[in-house]
Amino acid sequence: MKKSNSTFKDVFFPVIFLLTSCISSCSDSDRKDKTTNSSTSVNIQFPFPTEHYDEALDGRLILLISKQTETEPRFQLRDDSKTCQGFGMDINDWKPNEPQRFDMEAFGYPIHSFKDLPSGEFFVQVLFHKYETFNRADGHVVKLPMDRGEGQQWNRAPGNLYSTPQKVTIRNGQFPSLTIKLDQKIPPITEPEDTKYVKHLKIKSKLLSDFWGRDMYLGAHVLLPEGWETHPNVKYPLAIMHGHFPSDFGGFRTTPPDPELKSDYSERFNVEGYNRIVQQEANDFYKTWTGPDFPRVIAVKIQHPTPYYDDSYAVNSAAQGPYGDAITYELIPYIEQQFRGIGEGWSRFVYGGSTGGWESLAVQVKYPKEYGMCFAACPDPIDFRAYCLVNIYEDENAYYEEGIFRKTLVAGHRDYLGNVNATLRDMNYRELVLGTKGRSGQQWDIWEATYSPIDEEGYPKRIWDRLTGKIDKEVAAYWKENYDLAYILKRDWAKHGKDWTNKIHLYCGDMDNYYLNNAVYLAEEILSETTAPYYNGEVDYGDRAEHCWNGDHDNGNHISRLRYHRMFIKKYVEKVHNVAPKHADLKSWRY
C-alpha cells in the first residue's frame, strides 16, 4: 500500500451537539469482538452525507486520532508503536437526515476504550468504509466492501467518505461535543492504458458471478515478449506472478529514472533515495526483457480482489467462492488464447513472494497438472503447525504462551535481529477496529476468509476468538484438511507425487519478520522424506534475511524484491526440460 504525502493544517470546526440515534459497534454474532462501557457517551456526531449519497448506507465508521501532521490520520493506523489511535463501529441502514454518533462501546486500538485515552491536543479524522449487499448462491445475504479498483484498501477506496482532520482537546478520556462532516469523497481509479509491451484485460467470470449473485470480474496485466508482433507463429510459456493487487505491471519502465524525482527514504530498508532505485531497476528490467539473451515468455500479473481482501489467495473457499477454478479455467486460458500462449500445464509456471508465495505453492498443490513449476518465496504459513508462531492444532491460545503462574504475549513481528515491535494480539486488534465479521480487508482476516468454513450468517468462522485468542479446534481441523499445504503434500503424495516432482521450489529468510521460515522448515522435512518419486525441487534460506527473501544470496532484500521476473523466469527455463513432455516445443520461443 502506498503512503500518502498529503498534509493538513490546524483547522477548528464549530462545535455542535445533536441528539442522535445510537449505533452498536458490532452485530450480535460479533458482540464478543468489542469492549463495552456504556457509562459515558462520546459526543461526536455525523450528519448524513447528503451531498454524496441519497440512499441508505451500510458500512464501517472509523475514528482516527493522531498527534502527527505529516500525513492524514487515515494513513497512520499500523501494527507498530508509531500507530495512531483508532476506533471502529458498524453502521447498518443509515438513512438520510439521520445523524449518527460514537459511544463508549466502540472498540479501539491500541487503546481499547475512550475512557483510557490520554489528555492533550490531537487531530481527529473520520472515515466511512462503504459496504454493499451480496445475495450469494449459497443463500446467505452478506454486507461487504466491494472492491472498486483500488485493491481493497479501506483508506483509498473510491466512494468512501472521510472528514477534513480537525484539532480537538481530550481531557480525562472525554471528547468535546463535535459535529464532524464527511465532506470528502475518494474519487474513482484511473485505469492504465495499453502500451507496446503491456496490455490490460478484464473478463467477467461466470463462476464467480454465479456465486456472488452479481457480475464479478477478473483482470490481468500482460507483459508481451520482445518480438511478439514479428513472430506471429510462435506460442509462448506463461509466467504468472502471484501477489497483492497490482494496479499495473509494475517494475517495467521503458525510460530512465525521472530526473525531477524527489528522493525519498525507505523506513523498511533504511535506504535513502529508494524511489530512484525502484525506477532504475524497472528500467534495467526493460533493457533485460528486450535484450538478446532473455527468454521469450509472456509475463502476467493477475487482478483478483474480493470483498474481503486485495486478492483471493487464488483458491476456492467457502466464503469467497471458486476463485481458484475461475483463475485456472477461465482467466488463464483466455490470456493464452488472446496472446498466443502454449496453453499446456508444463508451459505455465507461477512465482511470487509472501501472499504470492503461498498462492504459488497452493495452485501447484491444488492443480498439480495445470501448472508446470512453482517458485514460492517467503510464503505465508504453508504448515499450520507454524501459523506464524501459533500451532493451531496443539496450542490452546493464539495470543499467549501460558504457564501455571504467568502468561507471555506471542510476538507478531520482529526485525532481523529478533527485536519484537508488534504482538500477534495487537495485530488482530487493529483489524478488529477496521471491521467485524472478517471485513477489515487485512491479513489475519483474509486467512480466515480463505481457509475457514462459514458461520450461520455466511461470514468466515474465526480460527480463534478475536478478543481472547482461544483457538477453535473444529475450525483448525477444517483448515488442516483443506488448506494446510504441507500436510496435504504428505497426505496426497502417493496420489499426486508424480505430478508434483521437479516443480516445488521454496525460499525464505531465516529471520523472516513474520516468522514464516518456521513453516518452511516443517514443509522441508516433509518434502525431504518423499519417495517414489522424490520431490526433486529446492528449499533455500537466507542468513539473517527478513521478509521477503527470495533466493538471492548476492543482493539485499531492497534489490532482490525488485527482480522476481528476472530470477524466476530464468530458473524456469533452466529446469523446464524436467517437466515438459517429449512433444513440447522448447525452441521456437528461444529466439
Language-model region placement:
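A short, compositionally biased domain-edge/stem linker segment
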Residues: 21, 26-33, 48-50, 182-190, ...
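Short, solvent-exposed linear motifs at loop/edge-of-secondary-structure regions
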Residues: 53-69, 329-330
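Contiguous beta-strand segments within globular domains
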Residues: 38-48, 54-62, 217-221, 240
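Small/flexible residues
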Residues: 4-5, 11, 33-34, 62, ...
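Bacterial Sec-dependent N-terminal signal peptides
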Residues: 1-41
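Non-catalytic cap/lid and distal C-terminal segments of serine-dependent acyl enzymes
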Residues: 67-107, 112-591
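A diffuse structural propensity rather than consistent per-protein peaks
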Residues: 7-9, 13, 62, 322, ...
